[in-house]
Amino acid sequence: MGQKVNPIGLRLGINRNWESRWFPNFKTAAAYLGEDHKIRTYLKKELYYAGVSNIVIERTAKRLRVTIIAARPGIIIGKKGSDIEKLKDTLQALVGKPLSVNIKEEKKAQISSQLVAENVATQLERRVAFRRAMKKVMQNAQRGGAKGIKVSVSGRLGGAEMARTEWYLEGRVPLHTLRAKIDYGFAEAHTTYGCIGVKVWIFKGEVLTKGIPAEVKEEQQKEGARRPKRAPKRENSGKAE
């Protein structure tokens, strides 16, 4: 099952948080979901070259807050914050209610699965060989600290008449392990031969139930093994005179 299901949805509430954070009632659920879809679709299309890795939408009783996590936040903010004000006005007109927009920088773009997938898709649209594009991003991800990465491309690869799927794996990507912190991204490359789908899985390490990384636990175990063991206390078997 872990091989088929979306690894992000499988780990929600375990080591992954929701991207839409609000509590609706029966009447407002459909309206809120539609607003979230409009916001995400618009931002993904307009800010594609800013490298948007994630969009978090939070709601309170009277307020809506949109947090955009991007690799190149300067493109979104603009000169002296002019572009972000235009973006805010556009989103308010789109959903018909006041909102605030926050921008955060994606500091590790090399191991962000969504950005890696979009990078491969962009290279395929520029007619770069798909194997070269896949191996390049996998090398960059491992340099960035990824424990494992899997990249899959599907479609008319290299202009072949019959569509097929090819994938490469470096390191380990334990999809069945729920405590494994796995990021997943998907992108599409629109080429002259048709649409090519790109999927990326990145394994960033294991997180224990209490939130302690597995690497820290290993170091603690090594430190415990290095400590010299004390000799057991000798019991005085002789009788006191």
From Swiss-Prot:
<keyword id="KW-0689">Ribosomal protein</keyword>
<feature type="compositionally biased region" description="Basic and acidic residues">
    <location>
        <begin position="215"/>
        <end position="226"/>
    </location>
</feature>
<feature type="domain" description="KH type-2">
    <location>
        <begin position="39"/>
        <end position="107"/>
    </location>
</feature>
<dbReference type="Pfam" id="PF00189">
    <property type="entry name" value="Ribosomal_S3_C"/>
</dbReference>
<keyword id="KW-0694">RNA-binding</keyword>
<keyword id="KW-0687">Ribonucleoprotein</keyword>
<comment type="subunit">
    <text>Part of the 30S ribosomal subunit. Forms a tight complex with proteins S10 and S14.</text>
</comment>
<comment type="function">
    <text>Binds the lower part of the 30S subunit head. Binds mRNA in the 70S ribosome, positioning it for translation.</text>
</comment>
<dbReference type="InterPro" id="IPR005704">
    <property type="entry name" value="Ribosomal_uS3_bac-typ"/>
</dbReference>
<dbReference type="GO" id="GO:0019843">
    <property type="term" value="F:rRNA binding"/>
</dbReference>
<dbReference type="GO" id="GO:0003729">
    <property type="term" value="F:mRNA binding"/>
</dbReference>
<dbReference type="GO" id="GO:0003735">
    <property type="term" value="F:structural constituent of ribosome"/>
</dbReference>
<dbReference type="InterPro" id="IPR015946">
    <property type="entry name" value="KH_dom-like_a/b"/>
</dbReference>
<protein>
    <recommendedName>
        <fullName>Small ribosomal subunit protein uS3</fullName>
    </recommendedName>
</protein>
<dbReference type="InterPro" id="IPR004044">
    <property type="entry name" value="KH_dom_type_2"/>
</dbReference>
<keyword id="KW-0699">rRNA-binding</keyword>
<dbReference type="Pfam" id="PF07650">
    <property type="entry name" value="KH_2"/>
</dbReference>
<dbReference type="InterPro" id="IPR036419">
    <property type="entry name" value="Ribosomal_S3_C_sf"/>
</dbReference>
<feature type="region of interest" description="Disordered">
    <location>
        <begin position="214"/>
        <end position="241"/>
    </location>
</feature>
<dbReference type="InterPro" id="IPR001351">
    <property type="entry name" value="Ribosomal_uS3_C"/>
</dbReference>
<dbReference type="GO" id="GO:0022627">
    <property type="term" value="C:cytosolic small ribosomal subunit"/>
</dbReference>
<dbReference type="InterPro" id="IPR009019">
    <property type="entry name" value="KH_sf_prok-type"/>
</dbReference>
<dbReference type="GO" id="GO:0006412">
    <property type="term" value="P:translation"/>
</dbReference>
<dbReference type="InterPro" id="IPR018280">
    <property type="entry name" value="Ribosomal_uS3_CS"/>
</dbReference>
<dbReference type="InterPro" id="IPR004087">
    <property type="entry name" value="KH_dom"/>
</dbReference>
<comment type="similarity">
    <text>Belongs to the universal ribosomal protein uS3 family.</text>
</comment>
